[in-house]
Amino acid sequence: MSPPAHSPRGPRTSAARPRVAFLGPSGTFTEQALLSQPDLAAAECVPIRSISETIFEVDSGRAELGVVPIENAIEGSVNETLDTLAFEASEHLFIHREIVVPVDLNLCVKPGTKLSDVTTVVSIPHASAQCRDWLATKLPGVEVQASNSTAEAARHVSKARTAGRAAIAPSLAAKLYGLEVVAAGIHDHPDNSTRFWMIGHGIPARTGHDKSTVVVFQTHQDRPGGLLTILQEFNARGINLTKIESRPTKRELGSYCFIIDFEGHLSDELVADVLRSLAAKHEVRLLGSYAAAGREAGARRQAVGKAWREASRWVDGLRARVQLP
């Protein structure tokens, strides 16, 4: 899908009540992620039909911020989010923070429907996959249909004329659309959670507990050791990687880029230094430097940063002793 025409004028301004787009309709885990942020309690929350459209809503300036899913603990990355941000959105759009929400998946039906009545299950493919074993055991042979979101599945079931349809959705969506939970907690793994990105224009200030995400396009893909040379840049500076994966660049068959999450913020000298080195050798795009959901990253970065500063002072002391010609 191509992005709508937009200009890099930045977001519309509304300090009192920011407009925040999210993957809708109401009742999605994405909305739960948005509502979990105290500083957005007064925001105008706008449900959008798809992930890419949510991103373009912010990119165009029609919304100040947006919230989209990026990774599930069981099913991995949400490729639509990665690809839209990496290849289609403008370079004025950045990740502002990450939000982690525990996943609570239930089988939701119209009131009075029994589990034995269910013939069709509807949900977003990521959610259906997280319940694969449960479905195979409890509803073998059931037809599984795709929707844009868990809440969209719940809304679809609420409007269905037949009683044999069920939605895999959170309890919030079941309540919102007048459905009953016929089976609760049907996800196959108990410690399931989903990570979300909040996106907006500009790069937010350093918090001390930050992560960054960068896309690296290899200049020479036919040379061995390409990934190793990229990883060595981070290792040499003591920067911890939290995630790395490859994605097709959409340019030609066999052409891949690396999307890397790592600890630290652009304002950190070590992070700025690794980006300089990468950009000198490869095509690089920074997707964001943003507040991390946990505080472990900050503690590690502070320790590494202190060691690096001490080493820099030592080198500066030696250089000060160099005699002038």
Where are each of the predicted segments found?
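Domain-level signature for soluble enzymes in the chorismate/prephenate branch of the shikimate pathway
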Residues: 1-325
